[in-house]
């Protein structure tokens, strides 16, 4: 027989059944005014949220371990869990408590995960929450599919396995899905991205199913217009992506109606090291400011900020988009940007409101904010009706899409109060005059106070009890209260409802009839409001495509206005794109350093020129530490990036040829988490650059070789410089502390020497931060040490030691050509075994053919 003590209670049976469907997710189980978590979930939540862990009663013969959070505080706790990379299933009571036999019916209504956030309280205004799925293909390739649920566009891509880390850095997902059957080596590549990641069942990554899902999602018959029909690995990733996104939202995603296929050759490569070293969106300390993005972002809306960040991190090699933005900015600079920016202020985040509307999660006050924004845009449209002549093409398209969809504003105004309650469950949302039945029910509630006062007056007159009161509370409903001293005057038709210490509370047939009517009206009014709200959401679904277009246009206009404002305020110039290979910058400045100097009163930024061309592709940069070599290199890269985005640049003039990548090897820091030493990281990044850079790439090499011994470092630096000059032929800024490398340009005509100037005054040094032709005469390292506060005895000792070392080097220096090409190795003789290996394609062999080939190779090996 089953021991009753070992069986679970009905409520725990319900919980365990729900938990079984979400084994890897924290389940928040609604019980009254709290969300409870049980057993292992409770222990985990208590640890992560710092909430109390308790044990109450028993179920299945064991104490029930539990913890809970108030329902009205849920969003704050969710935000903390999401930040920690956790996912949470929200389980609500959906049944009627009054009619339920046993536990009230409950079900999971949504799953909140780091990559599928839609709640305003959980999202960063300036950043997307991105869900990425990756599928490993059969031939050393993989497919990627990603989306932001609030943005409404699916992205597909194919890449080689060894390019995966670059793609992960580019997409920067909040959550990553991958096939549980991937190889260990592939899984290790995925773990370079520090985000929430989960292995999903292999059947979810189905290429044919993914293609069908894309067709259904986009409501098209073919993917040919996107040239996306043959991307089988990406289709497999899309299958898992869409299935997971729909599962977390508990419904389809009707607002996701865009598709973009991103191809490797379309974007300018910005590896993770480049994004980090140039401090595009985060400082080297991991802070949001001061960065290039924080300097540029004067957008009036969150969606404008997100669009601007996307532009900054995804510049295209094709110049058409950048040129269109430059033309739009030029027009906005001439006057309209100030007026437009004033009108953009106060606009709501239409993009995220539209997504929440499509998912039926939108709140009443968000609908009011949407209506107010549409009102503002309608007024702007009417004012701009006669100003469209002469607009650049990009602005023309934007203003066309900014038209509010006809009827949407009026519908919102008819249904929703100007100042509604925060949630529909509280009532007070639907406008007066919208629905006659609701108005009638509200009238009953409104007349309640008048009826109670009138009844109180009549009962006082009838009973002679002067202090008699007619009142209401949520526990006991309506009642007539009589004090103890007046109880002898109570009529026979009063029925006792509650006894207090100093009074009795009664109800009469008349008051009971009114109570039934009033309470019924309140419940019916709330139910009616909820029904009307659902009807409104139904009608608004038809406007989602137009609202999505409007949101994209509004975001683009906001971002363009921000770039126009920055160009005027910071005195930036328009770059010029040319076909010949060149980076020609006159009076260039580092935008972030210049802004910081202006803020802190640190003086004026020293502008510098940079000229790289087909004739001179490399600069060997020498000069003192603290002189500004790294700043100069970074500013060149930032100017190239800004121009490629379609922004004005911090320079007097800029001519730019084709660019396909910006690579940086600047500074070094131990990657302890991945067990990489400083020098190993330095060499790894250098190797990646040497393998991937092309003649159209910009390469920044700062102090390469400093992580090892002097001779090793010098030899490696010389070899790397020669490879970049002779083989890669990339535009290269090569800063070094090895003065032997100043001899490099004498033997390599595509390189020139430049140096950062400084002057000495006695034992002191003044940095001029100016780039001048020719090599530096010395490094001034000891002078820098003195500036840093190193004790004078150490400085004096160092000066004597330096003098002795320089004398010794002059006398004994070996005459070694650092830059001579290595002797050519003898051409290897190809053996029969080599030829046999060359003819084998492992991917096409059957098991029997593979075995035969193995025996043949063994035979040839014995003969060799």
UniProtKB/Swiss-Prot annotation:
UniProt-listed InterPro entries: DNA_mismatch_repair_MutS, DNA_mismatch_repair_MutS-lik_N, DNA_mismatch_repair_MutS/MSH, DNA_mismatch_repair_MutS_C, DNA_mismatch_repair_MutS_clamp, DNA_mismatch_repair_MutS_core, DNA_mismatch_repair_MutS_N, DNA_mismatch_repair_MutS_sf
Source superkingdom: Bacteria
GO cellular component, one term: cytosol
Annotated binding of ATP, by residue: 623-630
Alphabetical GO biological process terms: mismatch repair
Entries under PROSITE patterns matching the protein: DNA_MISMATCH_REPAIR_2
GO molecular function: ATP binding; ATP-dependent DNA damage sensor activity; damaged DNA binding; mismatched DNA binding
Keyword annotations from UniProtKB, A to Z: ATP-binding, DNA damage, DNA repair, DNA-binding, Nucleotide-binding
UniProt-listed SMART domains: MUTSac, MUTSd
Biological role: This protein is involved in the repair of mismatches in DNA. It is possible that it carries out the mismatch recognition step. This protein has a weak ATPase activity.
HAMAP family listed in its UniProt record: MutS
Family that this chain belongs to: Belongs to the DNA mismatch repair MutS family.
Identification of the protein by name: DNA mismatch repair protein MutS
Source organism of this protein record: Polaromonas sp. (strain JS666 / ATCC BAA-500)
Species lineage: Bacteria, Pseudomonadati, Pseudomonadota, Betaproteobacteria, Burkholderiales
